[in-house]
């Protein structure tokens, strides 16, 4: 996957496409994003549907909250170990083949969760699922870098990230329905049917991606020569603003580690919500799996327009940091209100909605930062490294919350820790180095 290519000289070289760049980018977006959003929706669903399985699985298999939290989180150990190698392979082989491989293998392993019968099998399959899915999200971020300039990525990434709340919006009711409808259908239990049914679409999507996704702008038969020149020209114009560096330099760059720390704090809060929301709703007095699924969809439904509006506003203002800081404090308020209203279903849902909408709107803005400062192999390695270090929080968060629940017999201590992490994230975002802020501003200004 290469960046922009050399362009022919002459004033008329990109004149046709240049007359309506918005129309051109809308066309690109409609071609790429619907398929990628659907794929990531199932990635999120297969990652977090264990939260709905918990409503019955822990009783059937006699798991404690600590066992569940460790199993939910161990996914991210496999994910982290395979993340950077996976993204470097994508850089060499191209997005089409590697993303298709990721989809097929994670779909098979997600369906295989139905054979879990002990803590050991739970841990092993969740670990392997993490290995299988590694590289998908940073690979998509890296892929979109080669289609959109920095000034458009806030909206584009916010649109792509709609997959996360969509998985909650659709996955909650669907998971609840499957577990209700298949409750007495042999040869499996309801939660086993849920894993099997929800794993199959990823395999089918892998086949679709293999035959339809274009690796590069120049491979897209649905674009004219003028349109390809226009897209390549916009990418070429910003390349000198980004650091030209190697894979090793991304590992040595202190900006990589600063951004990883920010992402770690954000992801801690995110998976604190995702893996435990069904349990919190259930403990507020809702016992039906279907109703838990329907009510758990409400925060995600609100997150969708929030992400779009915040992403567009951030692009128009060409400003990321203070948008993110405001969202961090909104998320803090959401977690603290969860403590206050944990036994009142509708107020609790309002608090969960604040926390969910805040984290969902923050993440696409975060990913505009590394895509503005790295390029080439350094971008592939830097994005994967930031993502892999950040998502280690996906292991820590569910395990920590489960351990604290077992230790204190209450959800409050875990919620207080998650609220504190939002404050830490806000401070780290505010402390983004001046050099990084200047470089981001230069790229944004260049693409206005």
Q: Model-derived features: where do they sit?
A:
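Extracytoplasmic gate region of multi-pass secondary transporters
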Residues: 50-51, 248-311, 363, 367, ...
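C-terminal transmembrane helical hairpin of 12-TM major facilitator-type secondary transporters
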Residues: 320-369
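Helix-breaking motifs and short loop linkers at transmembrane-helix boundaries and internal kinks
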Residues: 62, 94, 115-121, 132, ...
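Conserved MFS/SLC helix-loop-helix module at the cytosolic interface between two early adjacent transmembrane helices
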Residues: 81-120
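Cytoplasmic membrane-interface "Motif A"-like loop-to-helix N-cap segments
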Residues: 91-103, 315-328
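Glycine-rich segments within core transmembrane alpha-helices of 12-TM secondary carriers
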Residues: 155-179, 201-202, 387-397
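Helix-to-loop junctions at the C-terminal end of transmembrane segments
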Residues: 82-94, 306-319, 405
């Amino acid at each position: 996957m290469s960046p922009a290519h050399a362009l022919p000289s002459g004033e008329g070289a990109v004149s046709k496409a240049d007359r309506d760049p918005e129309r051109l980018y809308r066309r690109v977006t409609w071609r790429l994003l619907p398929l990628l959003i659907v794929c990531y929706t199932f990635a999120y669903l297969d990652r977090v549907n264990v939260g709905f399985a918990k409503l019955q699985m822990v009783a059937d298999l006699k798991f404690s909250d600590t066992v569940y939290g460790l199993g939910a989180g161990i996914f991210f150990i496999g994910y982290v170990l395979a993340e950077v190698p996976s993204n470097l392979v994508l850089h060499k082989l191209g997005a089409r083949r590697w993303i298709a491989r990721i989809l097929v293998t994670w779909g098979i392993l997600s369906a295989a969760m139905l054979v879990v019968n002990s803590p050991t099998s739970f841990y092993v399959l969740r670990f392997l699922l993490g290995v299988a899915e590694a590289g998908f999200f940073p690979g998509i971020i890296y892929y979109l870098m080669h289609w959109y300039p920095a000034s458009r990525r806030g909206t584009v990434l916010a649109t792509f990230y709609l997959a996360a709340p969509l998985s909650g919006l659709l996955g909650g009711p669907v998971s609840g329905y499957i577990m209700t409808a298949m409750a007495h259908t042999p040869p499996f239990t309801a939660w086993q049917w849920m894993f099997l049914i929800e794993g199959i679409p990823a395999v089918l999507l892998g086949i679709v991606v293999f035959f339809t996704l274009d690796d590069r702008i120049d491979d897209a038969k649905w674009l004219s020569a003028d349109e390809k020149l226009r897209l390549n020209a916009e990418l070429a114009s910003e390349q000198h603003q980004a650091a030209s560096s190697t894979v090793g330099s991304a590992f040595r760059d202190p900006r990589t580690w600063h951004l990883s720390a920010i992402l770690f704090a954000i992801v801690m809060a995110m998976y604190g919500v995702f893996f435990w929301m069904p349990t919190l709703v259930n403990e507020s007095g809702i016992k039906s799996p279907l109703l838990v699924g329907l009510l758990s969809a409400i925060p995600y439904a609100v997150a969708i327009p929030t992400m779009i509006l915040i992403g567009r506003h951030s692009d128009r203002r060409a400003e990321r940091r203070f948008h993110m800081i405001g969202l961090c404090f909104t998320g803090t308020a959401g977690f603290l209100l969860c403590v206050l209203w944990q036994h009142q279903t509708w107020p609790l849902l309002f608090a969960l909605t604040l926390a969910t909408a805040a984290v969902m709107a923050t993440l696409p803005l975060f990913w505009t930062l590394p895509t503005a400062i790295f390029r080439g192999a350094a971008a592939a390695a830097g994005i994967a490294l930031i993502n892999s270090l950040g998502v280690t929080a996906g292991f820590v968060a569910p395990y920590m919350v489960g351990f604290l629940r077992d230790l204190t017999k209450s959800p409050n201590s875990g919620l207080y820790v998650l609220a504190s992490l939002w404050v830490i994230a806000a401070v780290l975002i505010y402390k983004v180095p001046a050099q990084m802020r200047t470089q981001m501003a230069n790229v944004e200004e260049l693409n206005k």
